[in-house]
Amino acid sequence: KIPLTEKSELLWIPVVVNGKSYDFILDTGASFTMISQDLAKDMGATIIGDPVFVGGGESTGGYGQRAFIENMNVGPVSLKNVIAFVSENPTDDDPLKVDAVLGMDFIERAGEIQIDLAAMTLIIPAQTTALPASGRNIILETNIPVVESTDANGNRYTFILDTGASGANLSDLWFAKNAEVAAALPVETQNVWGHGGTVQLEIVKVPEFKLTIGTSSAEFKDLPATVPANGTVSSSRDGRLGMGLLKQFSKVIFNFEDMFVAFE
C-alpha cells in the first residue's frame, strides 16, 4: 500500500529517486511521466535529445525535453531507465504549481492499480482483479484510458478517464450531439489550465447529468460543457472524467490487463 495525499483536489503519490522522495500527481490523463526543469536538476536526471511537443489536457500543450532517470521507485515497484518529459518550471499563474506528474507509462506497467479513496492509499495487487461480468469497458488511446458509458436516457458516450483533472466536463462533441438542450443554456466563460498555460473556453453548465459505467452510476450537478468554437467540433470524445467522478466512490480499480475500470 502506497500512501496518497490530496492537494488542490488531486491525488499525489511519493516517488523515490536516488534515495530522495518527491510528490508526483497520479495522472491517468498523461501519456508520460513529466518533471519540471528544476526537479530534473535536483534529481540528477540526464537531459537527452531535442525538445518534443507534449499535449496538455484542455490547453494548447507545449514543448519539453526528455530526461533519463536511472532508477525510480513507486512503493514496491522499481523502474529502471525511465524516460520522462521535462516541462518548463511552473509559472506564477499556474494554480497547482505542478512540477511532477506520474503518467500512464508507469501506471500501465503496474498492470492494475486500486485507488482506495476511503483509506487514501494506492494498492498494486499481487493478483489482479477478475474481469467483472459487465466486461471490458476501456481502451487506450495515445496511451490514455477512454471509458464507455451510458447516460440516463441510454445514450452511449466515451470519456477520457483523467485522474489528473480535479472535476469532470463535457466536450464540444457532447454539446454538438445534444445541441437542442445545450444551446438553450446560458453561455459562460471559463479558464482551463493545462500543460502550456491557460485557455479561455465558452461553456454552458448542464444542471444535472447522470451516467453509468459498468454497473456503477454517478451523478453530476452543473457539469460544464464546452461550446464548439466558431461552430467547429475539435474533440473526438464526449468529455473528461476526473476526480469529480472518482470521489463519488470509496475505491476505483484500473485494470490494464483485462482493460476495465470498476468502482466500489
Language model segments and positions:
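Pepsin/retropepsin-fold aspartyl endopeptidases
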Residues: K1-E264
